Amino acid sequence: MAVTKEDVIDFIAGMSVLELSELIGEFEEKFGVSAAAPVAVAAAGVAAEAVEEKTEFDVILASAGSEKIKVIKEVRAITGLGLKEAKSLVESAPAALKEGVSKDEAAELKAKLEAVGATAEVK
């Protein structure tokens, strides 16, 4: 009667940890292999990071343009700041309005600012 794979698996399942360790050592010697996990090349990790897409963006008010009052109103709506704080923010341009927002939200905020005459950037 031939030994099946299931017989081998059942036999191995009944072994202690010490016996399994010795068995693995014997396999490594007999077949010239190693049971260690393969190590990834460091350069491959660098390439993977370069492909990773940015997920958080900052909306920067570059300048208020000629319609400063409209821009202040829009900045208040976007940030929830009071009138005085929004005015100071607009006058101190370039300044960050929102940080760590999604790509879609950043594009939407930029479009709103440009619609009232401001110059905005997404970084």
UniProtKB/Swiss-Prot annotation:
Keyword Membrane (UniProt): no
GO biological process: translation
Cystine residue pairs: none
Keywords: Ribonucleoprotein, Ribosomal protein
GO CC, any one term: cytosolic large ribosomal subunit
Top-rank taxon, per record: Bacteria
GO molecular function: mRNA binding; structural constituent of ribosome
UniProt xrefs under SUPFAM superfamilies: ClpS-like (SSF54736), Ribosomal protein L7/12, oligomerisation (N-terminal) domain (SSF48300)
TM ranges: none
InterPro entries attached to this UniProt entry: Ribosomal_bL12, Ribosomal_bL12_C, Ribosomal_bL12_C/ClpS-like, Ribosomal_bL12_oligo, Ribosomal_bL12_oligo_N_sf
Family membership: Belongs to the bacterial ribosomal protein bL12 family.
Primary role: Forms part of the ribosomal stalk which helps the ribosome interact with GTP-bound translation factors. Is thus essential for accurate translation.
Assembly and interaction partners: Homodimer. Part of the ribosomal stalk of the 50S ribosomal subunit. Forms a multimeric L10(L12)X complex, where L10 forms an elongated spine to which 2 to 4 L12 dimers bind in a sequential fashion. Binds GTP-bound translation factors.
Annotated protein name in UniProt: Large ribosomal subunit protein bL12
Gene: rplL
